[in-house]
From Swiss-Prot:
Primary gene name: HBB
Source species: Alligator mississippiensis
Protein known as: Hemoglobin subunit beta
Expression sites by tissue: Red blood cells.
Pfam family membership, one: Globin
Domain called Globin: residue spans: 2-146
Single GO term (MF): metal ion binding
Keywords carried by this UniProt record: Acetylation, Heme, Iron, Metal-binding, Oxygen transport, Transport
GO cellular component, one term: haptoglobin-hemoglobin complex
Subunit structure: Heterotetramer of two alpha chains and two beta chains.
One record GO biological process: hydrogen peroxide catabolic process
Length: 146
């Protein structure tokens, strides 16, 4: 589904205010704390026994920034999200063997983080636009899975 002018404005305007490093670290940390079984994908990041370890893990913070920066590319490619994420989908499917359900979970967490960091901007219309965006990104990342 394509984005109308109002949805695009909500997405672009809010994204311009996002601190990618802070929100990315927050989003990935939240996923690893709320869904501890997801830590198995990141065992090489070192000690992650509890929330404190995760919140202070520099590798989690760096990867969170990388993940959210990649998500931000969707904002620049609203007309071709699936095409833009084709290589990343293949990588996560074939090399990392990530369960595609993780993309939906992380998308939902990104929504929570954006709302928490930008409550004054996160109207119900903005929420709807970003929910549509995270669904499309999750579907694009899952496209290589059979």
């Amino acid at each position: 589904a394509s984005f109308d002018a109002h949805e695009r404005k909500f997405i672009v305007d809010l994204w311009a205010k996002v601190d990618v490093a802070q929100c990315g670290a927050d989003a990935l940390s939240r996923m690893l704390i709320v869904y501890p079984w997801k830590r198995r994908y990141f065992e090489h990041f070192g000690k992650m026994c509890n929330a404190h370890d995760i919140l202070h893990n520099s590798k989690v913070q760096e990867h969170g920034k990388k993940v959210l920066a990649s998500f931000g590319e969707a904002v620049k490619h609203l007309d071709n999200i699936k095409g833009h994420f084709a290589n990343l989908s293949k990588l996560h499917c074939e090399k990392f063997h990530v369960d595609p359900e993780n993309f939906k979970l992380l998308g939902d967490i990104i929504i929570i983080v954006l709302a928490a960091h930008h409550p004054e901007d996160f109207s119900v219309e903005c929420h709807a636009a970003f929910q549509k965006l995270v669904r499309q990104v999750a579907a694009a990342l899952a496209a290589e899975y059979h």
